[in-house]
Amino acid sequence: MDFSQLSGLLDGVKKEFSQLEEKNKDTIYTSKSGGGMVSVSFNGVGELVDLQIDDSLLEDKEAMQIYLMSALNDGYKSVEENRKNLAFSMLGNFAKL
């Protein structure tokens, strides 16, 4: 494989990655904690797109903080796991070439 072929291959990988990232923006990951009292939603690129807090938690700051941290951490882990899977998938496709 010469340099021009490698360059073309890398351009193809970049384009595929960009398309996957764009598609990933539309994927939503939702995590809940406290029996659903707190719900957070992230898109596939890790942006927080929704946050729901049950009104009963507004008077219990400590519980709200714990539930928020739990839901946020779980949501972030889901996004990161998806990103790892996409990366491995792309590497697998690259290795086949």
UniProtKB/Swiss-Prot annotation:
The keyword Ribosomal protein does not apply. GO terms for cellular component: bacterial nucleoid; cytoplasm. Keywords: Cytoplasm, DNA-binding. The keyword DNA-binding applies. It is found in: Cytoplasm, Nucleoid. SUPFAM superfamilies: YbaB-like (SSF82607). One of its GO terms (molecular function) is DNA binding. Its main location: cytoplasm. Binds to DNA and alters its conformation. May be involved in regulation of gene expression, nucleoid organization and DNA protection. Belongs to the YbaB/EbfC family. Homodimer. This is Nucleoid-associated protein Hac_0048. The lineage of its organism: Bacteria, Pseudomonadati, Campylobacterota, Epsilonproteobacteria, Campylobacterales.
